Amino acid sequence: LAPMRRAIAAAMARSKREIPHYYLQTRIDMRAALAWLQAENQRRSLTERLLPAVVLLKATARALRDVPSLNGHWIDGSLHVAEQVHLGFAIALKGGGLLAPAVHDVDTKSCGALMAELHDLIPRARAGRLRSSEMTDATLTVTNLGDLGVESVFGVIYPPQVAIVGFGRILDQPWAEQGMVGVRPVVTASLAADHRATDGHIGARFLDALSRHLQHPEQL
């Protein structure tokens, strides 16, 4: 195996061996978020336009502020909740393998600043030019496979983190509200979390907070 593949194999085997995962998922109406993105991008130049991934990252960070026990590390038999929200952003490498460098202080940055940071981070990750802090500081990882057509993804927690959030493709789906059925753009959000650190009701609160923040993208 290539060195990166060996490192991934060791980390994932350790995760499944040591971490009792629990899994939750929910469907989230993205109509408000996509409408806000469209309006926002009309005011921006082509190089400054925002992608849905940025809104999903920012909403995840805000939800972690609401439910902080998913934001941290399991070390020496106890949960250490992090003071900052540094989200690992999973990036597939062109030669194979995966990295999830940290985007720092996601909850305090604007969507525009986050988009600029991703434009810088992704090519550096693929060129092998990441800083050590970007490789070690993540407090939770986000994986998004929507651009590959996947509808949902359940990730494997990267130790010592205690959760990973996954997003699938945004799809038009039937949606019932107030007795009426229509079609909405919907994303499936999933959570894999460490049962030593939290229980299912904490995970459910997080997914509910995530959905609420995505209904009010102008506040992100």
Model-derived features with residue positions:
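C-terminal catalytic/motor cores of large multi-domain enzyme assemblies
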Residues: 1-220
